[in-house]
Amino acid sequence: MKQKQLLSFLVCILMLSSCAAPTDSAHDSGLMLRVYFADAEEIRLLPLEDYVFGALAAEMPANYAPEALKCQAVAARTRAVAQSRAFGGNGCVRHPDCDICTDSACCQAYQTDAQLKARWGSEYAVLRARIDRAVRATDGLLLTSGGLPIEVLYHACSGGKTEDAAAVFASAKPYLVSVDSPGEEGYAGFRADTSFSCEEAAALLLRAFPGCGVTADTLSSAIRLQSTTASGRVATLLVGSQTVRGADFRKTLSLRSTYFTWEADGDRIVFHTVGYGHGVGLSQAGAQAMAADGADFAEILAHYYPGTQLTRMDKTGFSGS
């Protein structure tokens, strides 16, 4: 299966190379994506590099360092190509007649030019230029492993150490392993508190985990840490009588990460979180910190996706970069 997918990927690369128009434009890979726009509930065809622009602008703050923006551009492009049915991908899970959608909970966020104008206001021209430079500087670059685009995962802030994919998604990848991510303390949401009344938290937990038996009165003693991952995140907890995955607990209470502790505060319970997101793959805050220390985008990507290669998809074919 993998050999067939690899052959399909290489053939498509060669086809795109031969049919691409002779222009110096960065937005000219030749690949068109079928994109499902969740807000408009419609399908649109977009050139790959135009899609990368909108995905980068939606997924990472435009005022991040240029090298961090380049990392996100490569990540967005790799995700799109990996999913593209033209390259043997499976397309969008929720919209199988499309390559990718604009719902960040499913594929990747995306914003149109009109949305960016409304969001950025008077800073539109400056911020748009920053995004455009990152896309053009990485034009055609993908992250690959074994000759195929990798499964790209990223998040806002790891809290100082990324997570192994197997601990979150039960699917191990040699390039999605836990690595140190220093310098993230400057991220605005590095530490955060989320507070609930015990009654509210108990109701949410009972709805998600029927039969666990928690009540507002017993909540503080009914939640007990059972195990942690290698990076220090919550792997499993006991919620009343049930063992619950940290990721499921986080989703139930909309916590910022599985890197959390908790304490009772009268008739309330407070969760203290570190970092933001699932913690797997590229930490955007970590990329920003590494860029501030002088690392270029290739070094940053090699750190967060160890063992992968930067591979160029361009008019001359498919080759290591």
Model-derived features with residue positions:
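Conserved, single-site charged/polar hotspot
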Residues: M1-S321
